[in-house]
């Protein structure tokens, strides 16, 4: 799709793995890959300003179609001039399709060929989301990268169910492409599904690749399967996708999963993990997980991470951050959130350098050992 506003440029392949260094060109700028994308569910990354996100090196952020459709409404955002203007963010934005949120409402939804009926989680009213509506909402939001409406089956669903599901997702993808009213300034990605079944992943990938999307997402992972099962699916799925298009692994943010995804050829990742755990005082550091609210840090006047040069670690101590969190001060959450986001954005920067140096496997081994991962307990 040469007229697509989304272009992928391969810079270098790592010699020993499937990892690749590249960049993705969008209407609102170019960002390097592999890249971790902070999640701004309600058109804001929780507690962080756009200036802070730029400062830490976030080249692209994600916003949530489902939540913005319900509140404040996609038509209001369109009248504001689109999501970039509405939230004062002049760099790339990716929107999901809303599908994952709808499917997480398992007790109140009904799937048909036309779309999904579900209850609005805010007021209980009946709502309907179709492939066409999901595209229309995203066209109003004006994101640089959009997602096709898909069904996200549980990883351990029976084979026959998953087969019917991916075939419907392919039909929905085709309907979404036809409904896309802004193909010259918004790029629409297809989403490969298929749970853990290699032949169904292949069928899904072949269907979507034949439609010539400007990029492809790998969905249906990080939904309860083991780390090893996720890697196995990536091992056989990413080679099914075109080398000249971006590859996006949805909903993945644990540090080892990011590195292992890159090794298997993934370019883009997103997850709420860094900000969600930060609100409970859990921090990612170069030496593993640190729960700064714990009593042992009451008089610890050192940074969260001795090897981190982020704003938080350059200015504040564990003892001070612990005090803020124990006192329910919002500034404490701002500091832990900034640090965790910076940690993952900076991890991807280090990964990009390791690809350039052809030593990603050595980098992974050193990182895993320092972080304290072991087979009995991953501790993200």
From Swiss-Prot:
Its EC number(s): 2.4.2.29
The protein's enzyme class: transferase
GO molecular function: metal ion binding; tRNA-guanosine(34) queuine transglycosylase activity
Residues at which Zn(2+) binds: 308, 310, 313, 339
Region of interest (RNA binding), residue spans: 251-257, 275-279
Annotated keywords: Glycosyltransferase, Metal-binding, Queuosine biosynthesis, Transferase, tRNA processing, Zinc
Cofactors required: Zn(2+)
Subunit structure: Homodimer. Within each dimer, one monomer is responsible for RNA recognition and catalysis, while the other monomer binds to the replacement base PreQ1.
Protein name: Queuine tRNA-ribosyltransferase
Organism, scientific name: Streptococcus sanguinis (strain SK36)
């Amino acid at each position: 799709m040469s007229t697509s506003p989304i272009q992928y440029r391969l810079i270098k392949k790592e010699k020993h793995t499937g990892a690749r260094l590249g960049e993705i060109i969008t209407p609102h700028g170019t960002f390097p890959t592999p890249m971790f994308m902070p999640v701004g569910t309600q058109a804001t990354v929780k507690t962080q300003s756009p200036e802070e996100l730029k400062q830490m090196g976030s080249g692209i952020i994600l916003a949530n179609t489902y939540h913005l459709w319900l509140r404040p409404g996609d038509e209001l955002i369109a009248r504001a001039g689109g999501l970039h203007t509405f939230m004062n963010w002049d760099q790339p934005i990716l929107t999901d399709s809303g599908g994952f949120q709808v499917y997480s409402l398992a007790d109140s939804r009904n799937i048909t060929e036309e779309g999904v009926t579900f209850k609005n989680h805010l007021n209980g009213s009946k709502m309907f989301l179709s492939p066409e509506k999901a595209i229309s909402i995203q066209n109003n939001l004006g994101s640089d990268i959009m997602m096709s409406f898909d069904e996200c089956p549980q990883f351990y669903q029976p084979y026959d169910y998953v087969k019917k599901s991916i075939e419907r997702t392919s039909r929905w993808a085709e309907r979404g492409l036809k409904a896309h009213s802004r193909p010259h300034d918004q790029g629409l990605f297809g989403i490969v599904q298929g749970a853990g079944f290699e032949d169904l992943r292949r069928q899904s990938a072949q269907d979507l690749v034949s439609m010539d999307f400007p990029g492809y997402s790998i969905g249906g992972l990080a939904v309860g399967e083991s780390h090893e099962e996720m890697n196995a699916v990536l091992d056989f799925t990413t080679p099914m996708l075109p080398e000249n298009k971006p590859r996006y692994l949805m909903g993945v943010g644990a540090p080892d999963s990011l590195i292992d995804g890159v090794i298997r050829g993934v370019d883009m990742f997103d997850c709420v993990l860094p900000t969600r755990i930060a609100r409970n005082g859990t921090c990612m550091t170069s030496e593993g997980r640190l729960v700064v609210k714990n009593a042992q840090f009451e008089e610890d006047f050192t940074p969260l991470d001795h090897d981190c040069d982020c704003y938080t670690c350059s200015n504040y101590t564990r003892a001070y951050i612990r005090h803020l969190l124990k006192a329910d001060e919002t500034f404490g959450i701002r500091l832990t959130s900034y640090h965790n986001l910076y940690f993952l954005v900076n991890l991807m920067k280090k990964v990009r350098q390791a690809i350039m140096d052809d030593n990603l496997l050595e980098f992974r081994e050193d990182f895993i050992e320092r972080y304290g991962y072991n087979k009995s307990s991953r501790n993200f």
